[in-house]
Amino acid sequence: MTISSSLTPKETLAELDRYIVGQAAAKRSVAIALRNRWRRQQVPSPLREEIAPKNIIMIGPTGVGKTEIARRLASLAQSPFIKVEASKFTEVGYVGRDVESMIRDLVELAISMVKDEEKKRIEGLAEANAEDRILDLLLPPTPVHSESSVDLLPASADVSAAGSSTKEKFRQMLRDGKLDEREVEVEVTETSQAPMVEVMGVSGMDDMQSNIQDAFSRMFPKKTKQSKMKVPDALDVLTKEEMEKLVDMEMVLKEALRRTEQSGIVFLDEIDKVASKGGSSHGPEVSREGVQRDLLPIVEGATVSTKYGMVKTDHILFIASGAFHVAKPSDLIPELQGRFPIRVELESLGKDEFVRILTEPENALTKQYIALLATEGVTLRFEDEAIEEIATIAVQVNESTEEIGARRLHTVVERVLDVLSFDACEREESEFVVTAQYVRDQLSEIAEDQDLSRYIL
């Protein structure tokens, strides 16, 4: 289903509710931010350029839905979306990735997105062209009496009568799969022989490395070779080749750059890891502040150089998130705080939320396991009491060890179904019911022993 970016906030909220339990405040904020992007596009030109997106900072412990909200939002908006960890960046001048690299990566994703859309649009034409090329190989236009060409035709076929009607008959045979066992010889492009180039050094070198690699690829022309393969394989190869020919890369690049600038979304995870704790200004704190100062112009609005052209970041939406266990949002430099005007606090998840997470979303964990085991002919069913027991144990383990939110459910459910998953393919009974007692039998010892649960759950 194609989702339009002109969804109303209520419609966006309803879509997010299908996959994410709770966190109404965070979902409202991103729904409004998405609608504001559409509103900006309707504003007349002079004022439109002045309207900047209202960046969001989401505060909450791990496993409460911060990343999932941003990811689902991007799919709803059909926007280029990239998730990066702020802690992976280093200050300009140090070894590591600089902050501009996330914009370059965003452009690459946008190009891939637009190119895939264009390929879907021209897929029918590319397949028709590939069919024509296959038929030309099976039905040469002029009679050739060499052994190789005779082998390609059925014994009863008359090569000299290969007119349009014969070609159409063969086309139908090709589509019906009657020629699947035939072999044809096609010209395929060999993989590039250009040497791999790696530039080691300070940050900002990744774009230079990419440019050097492209230059080497152009210096070494692509080689082709004759390859013998069956008709279906040849059809796949030729369809891809025809798609590459038909895709207008100039249009793709232009549209990708436009989408990056106008509707790109950058999710900055672990923003709290680059916050200076308590205003300290020495040692690693200096480097953290340096990363913040490098982030500032990008979030503020800057022009980033990429190998496809210049990209303005003025209208890219930035969504930052962090647990802020040690540092606080106020520990970020004031200028960066000002660039994230919307702050949303996500609530910790308890037993009730865990029960809902296991049952309500369309991609709920229990539904995933039911579908997986159905492939082995096993009908899996969870009793309500079993769901409650799983949620209770997940909460207990979170409280006694590390708090990892809903991610704990993956570990607990996997442990509960460990024996069944191993024996499913050899089971004689087709139905399996997970009861509360079964959950306790599988987990009681581990959940009670804190040392064990620390390592297993």
Curated annotation (Swiss-Prot):
The record's section on InterPro entries has: AAA+_ATPase (IPR003593), ATP-dep_Clp_protease_ClpX (IPR050052), ATPase_AAA_core (IPR003959), Clp_ATPase_C (IPR019489), HslU (IPR004491), P-loop_NTPase (IPR027417)
Give the classification, highest ranks: Bacteria, Pseudomonadati, Thermodesulfobacteriota, Desulfobulbia, Desulfobulbales
The answer on whether this UniProt entry bears the keyword Nucleotide-binding reads: yes
Query: What family, per the record?
Result: Belongs to the ClpX chaperone family. HslU subfamily.
Q: Which CDD domains does the protein's record reference?
A: RecA-like_HslU
Q: Which UniProt keywords apply?
A: ATP-binding, Chaperone, Cytoplasm, Nucleotide-binding
- GO biological process entries: protein unfolding; proteolysis involved in protein catabolic process
Q: Keyword check for rRNA-binding, yes or no.
A: no
**Cited NCBIfam families:** hslU, PRK05201.1
UniProt GO MF annotations: ATP binding; ATP hydrolysis activity; peptidase activity; proteasome-activating activity
Q: Look up and give the organism this protein is from.
A: Desulfotalea psychrophila (strain LSv54 / DSM 12343)
Q: Which SUPFAM superfamilies match?
A: P-loop containing nucleoside triphosphate hydrolases (SSF52540)
Q: Which residues bind ATP per the record?
A: 21, 63-68, 269, 335, 407
Described function: ATPase subunit of a proteasome-like degradation complex; this subunit has chaperone activity. The binding of ATP and its subsequent hydrolysis by HslU are essential for unfolding of protein substrates subsequently hydrolyzed by HslV. HslU recognizes the N-terminal part of its protein substrates and unfolds these before they are guided to HslV for hydrolysis.
Instruction: Give one Pfam family.
Output: AAA_2
> Quick one: where is this thing mainly located?
cytoplasm
Question: Can you quote a single GO CC term?
Answer: HslUV protease complex
Subunit record text: A double ring-shaped homohexamer of HslV is capped on each side by a ring-shaped HslU homohexamer. The assembly of the HslU/HslV complex is dependent on binding of ATP.
What name appears for this protein in its UniProt entry?
A: ATP-dependent protease ATPase subunit HslU
Where in or outside the cell it occurs: the entry states: Cytoplasm
